[in-house]
Every structure is written in structure tokens, then in C-alpha cells.
């Protein structure tokens, strides 16, 4: 889906509204249908309040930022950034492999991704610590390690605990190497490698613990979590343990001057030449989708982060993954440029032998992981001041066709001393 750009201040277009009647439908205009991509609440009687999914007819693109539209016979102004051209919706609904299993499992059959994951010390050591701190409780238990890869978590279980059995399930071809590693390390009596997809899994018994490292970009991308939840429902005992036990998605408004400078401002004067006409296409090319390998520095955070979603993996249902939405409010703590928002996730592991939990946090205030951070760039930076309020909403929506993909819709309002300064909305596909 093509993403929209953010809007400028309301005051920029007020002069053009004088004399217009918000309830009069202009005649003899070529009208085109647009879809509202996120809710908008009118701030005066020249504007329309709209909900996500509403359809409107464009009557007049008054400015780049504010359009005059008709909705169910009523006319008014709405931010252009909240609208998407209905004619550009070209999603292919007839695909042979909506899960892209061949591509997905193919990416895990070589060592490249496994080297990246095993080299991620915070990630891998967190799982090791979970096993170590709960080793007594794992004695004599049946453990399911779903999506085991090279089997590192299963190896930890065999080495540090005394389980009855570990079922190391892996659907990709790397399972052949995992079998050899189990033999080589002399743990084949404990660890049973099963090359199957989770949905086809057939175990000899239900398990006491289901452990998996299923997290992707923005926590959910690839949606391996669906397979984990299905395995939970089929194979985890009623009083069984899920590791991770809970998961959270976090967000913060941020400055990203270097990113914006390197990819947009660069075109102003390369080699003393004016290439500035390339700035709009550069913005669209580089910022239409999120930056998944961004490293956010703590000093670039413009406020304290917030937790958008808190998922209980013992009770979460697959249907809840289709669409998740949340409102947010940030209080800006320093003057600066708002270039966008950065997201990351954390997962928590229930302790069985003492109170509290262990946590793997992938955010900018914790040791860097291979997930890094996900940057959602605005099309243009916005000036903010200390004590400004940034409020809005975020919607995570799963792609109805390409089931491993999703979109993130961010809408925001910047307010200063109770007066709205800027309003905008942008849709980011990850990745279709």
C-alpha cells in the first residue's frame, strides 16, 4: 500500500476556507473515491470527522495537506494524509502460497540466519539463563522446543536440566544438521529432532513446557506466533508453561537527523549540483516502509517510551493477531525535530522457582540485539518543543492475503498549550 504524508498546521489553510459552506456540495466537479486510512476528529465546523474505512469523494485538492471532500452528502475539509486512493488498491487475492512457506523455510535452511541468531549474545544468553534458573523445575518434564533451528535451546535443556524428553521441532532443512549435532553431542536419548511444521506435529504426549524463539521485526512479522499458539492449544498441558510468557511492543517519538540527511537532504547539493527535484521520490523510496535495522540512540528519544501492546501468550488467541490498535500520548522532554517513531519489543519469561520473571528487551536502553530497532520515518521532520504533547494511535493489521506480512498505521497530533499544531497519518507496510 502506498503511504501518505503528514500534514502541515491548520493555520496554513484557514484563509482558503473563508466563504466556503461545509454543507454545500459543489457542482460539476470530477470526483474520485478515496478510503480513510485512520480516524480523524474535526476541530471546527469546516471539517469532517471520519472513521477508518470510510469512503469519501475528492472534490477539490485545496492544498497539498487539506482536501475538500464529500462523505455521505456532507462536504468538508480533511487532512490529505488520512486518505488513500481507492483505485490503487491492487492486492492479489488469488495466490498459490499465501504463507510463502517455500521462501520462508528456505531462508532458514542455510547457516546465515542461524549464525546471526547464535551470535546475538543477549538473545541466546537470556534463553540459557531461563533454563539455568528453572533447571530443578524442568527435571522429568516433557519440553517442546518449537522452531528449534540448530537446537540451541534444546541443548541448554539437556545440559542444564534433567528433562524426560525434549522435542526439537524444525520445519526447514537445517533439521538434518540439528540431528547430526544432537548425535555429536551425545544427547540423542534426551533430544528428539522432528522435521515437521507445527500444524502437522504429532507428539507421543502433551508437554509441560513450550519454549520458542518466534519473534520477528516489530515482534510479529512472519507471524510464527500463530504456529506457536496452535501448538500451545494442541500440545501444552493445561497447567503448562509458555516461554516467553508475555510479550510487549514499545514505541517512542524520535529524531533521526542522520537518516534523513543521508537519504533526503543529500540531494540538495551533491558535488555542488542541484538535485533537489529528487527529494520527493527519495522520500517515497526510502521512507515508504520502515527501517528494520535501525539503531536508535537513547539521546535521540524525544520523550519517555510507552508500551503499546502487552500480550499474554498463555491466553492470546490467533484471531486477535488480525488487528491490534492502541492510543498513545507522549510528553516531549526536549526541543528538537520529530523525524518519526521507533518501535521495539520485549519478552518476559515466567520464573518457576522464584518470584518475578526474566526479560529480553530489544530496546535502545538495553544491549543491542540482532533485531535492532524499527524506525517509522515521517516524510518531513516536524519541529517540536519541550512540553509539547504528541497524541495519536497505532494500528497493527495483518495482511489478509500474504499471511506473514502486516501494515502499521500511525496517526498523530502535536499539541502545544492545548492548541493543535500538526496532524498526520501514514501507513507502513511490513513488507506487503
Curated annotation (Swiss-Prot):
GO terms for molecular function: histone H3R8 methyltransferase activity; histone methyltransferase activity; nuclear estrogen receptor binding; protein-arginine N-methyltransferase activity; protein-arginine omega-N asymmetric methyltransferase activity. Gene3D superfamilies: Hnrnp arginine n-methyltransferase1, SH3 Domains, Vaccinia Virus protein VP39. Coiled coil: none annotated. GO terms for cellular component: cytoplasm; nucleus. S-adenosyl-L-methionine binds at residues 114, 123, 147, 170, 199. Residues 1-22 are annotated as: Disordered. It comes from the Eukaryota. The active site is at 213, 222. Residues 1-11 have a biased composition (Low complexity). Its EC number is 2.1.1.319. This is Protein arginine N-methyltransferase 2.
Amino acid at each position: 500500500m502506498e503511504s501518505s504524508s503528514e500534514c502541515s498546521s491548520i493555520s496554513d489553510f484557514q484563509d482558503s476556507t473563508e466563504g466556503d459552506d461545509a454543507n454545500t456540495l459543489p457542482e460539476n466537479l470530477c470526483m474520485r473515491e478515496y478510503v480513510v486510512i485512520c480516524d480523524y476528529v474535526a476541530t471546527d465546523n469546516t471539517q469532517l470527522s471520519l472513521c477508518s474505512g470510510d469512503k469519501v469523494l475528492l472534490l477539490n485538492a485545496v492544498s497539498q495537506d487539506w482536501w475538500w471532500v464529500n462523505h455521505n452528502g456532507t462536504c468538508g475539509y480533511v487532512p490529505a494524509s488520512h486518505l488513500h486512493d481507492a483505485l490503487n488498491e491492487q492486492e492479489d487475492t488469488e495466490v498459490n502460497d499465501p504463507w510463502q512457506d517455500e521462501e520462508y523455510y528456505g531462508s532458514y535452511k542455510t547457516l546465515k540466519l542461524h549464525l546471526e541468531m547464535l551470535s546475538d549474545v543477549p538473545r541466546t544468553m537470556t534463553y540459557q539463563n531461563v533454563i539455568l534458573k528453572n533447571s530443578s523445575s524442568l527435571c522429568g518434564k516433557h519440553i517442546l522446543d518449537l522452531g528449534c533451528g540448530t537446537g540451541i535451546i534444546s541443548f541448554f535443556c539437556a545440559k542444564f536440566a534433567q528433562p524426560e524428553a525434549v522435542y526439537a521441532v524444525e520445519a526447514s532443512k537445517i533439521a538434518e544438521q540439528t540431528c547430526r549435532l544432537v548425535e555429536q553431542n551425545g544427547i540423542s536419548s534426551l533430544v528428539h529432532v522432528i522435521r515437521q511444521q507445527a500444524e502437522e506435529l504429532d507428539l507421543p504426549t502433551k508437554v509441560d513446557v513450550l519454549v520458542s524463539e518466534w519473534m520477528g521485526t516489530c515482534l510479529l512479522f512472519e507471524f510464527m506466533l500463530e504456529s506457536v499458539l496452535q501448538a500451545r492449544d494442541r500440545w501444552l498441558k493445561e497447567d503448562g508453561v509458555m516461554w516467553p510468557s508475555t510479550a510487549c511492543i514499545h514505541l517512542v517519538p524520535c529524531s533521526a537527523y542522520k537518516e534523513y540527511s543521508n537519504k533526503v537532504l543529500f540531494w540538495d547539493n551533491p558535488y555542488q549540483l542541484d538535485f533537489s527535484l529528487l527529494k520527493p521520490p527519495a522520500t517515497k523510496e526510502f521512507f515508504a516502509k520502515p527501517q528494520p535495522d535501525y539503531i536508535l540512540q537513547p539521546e535521540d528519544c524525544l520523550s519517555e517510551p510507552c508500551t503499546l501492546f502487552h500480550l499474554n501468550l498463555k491466553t492470546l488467541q490467533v484471531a486477535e493477531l488480525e488487528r491490534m490498535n492502541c492510543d498513545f500520548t507522549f510528553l516531549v522532554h526536549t526541543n528538537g525535530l520529530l523525524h518519526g517513531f521507533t518501535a521495539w519489543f520485549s519478552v518476559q519469561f515466567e520464573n518457576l522457582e522464584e518470584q518475578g520473571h526474566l526479560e529480553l528487551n530489544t530496546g535502545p536502553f538495553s544491549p543491542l540485539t540482532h533485531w535492532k530497532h524499527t524506525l517509522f520515518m515521517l516524510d518531513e521532520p516536524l519541529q517540536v518543543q519541550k512540553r509539547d504533547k504528541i497524541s495519536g494511535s497505532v494500528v497493527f493489521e495483518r495482511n489478509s492475503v500474504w499471511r506473514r506480512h502486516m501494515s502499521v498505521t500511525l496517526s498523530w497530533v502535536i499539541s502545544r498549550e492545548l492548541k493543535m499544531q500538526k496532524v498526520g497519518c501514514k501507513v507502513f507496510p511490513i513488507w506487503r
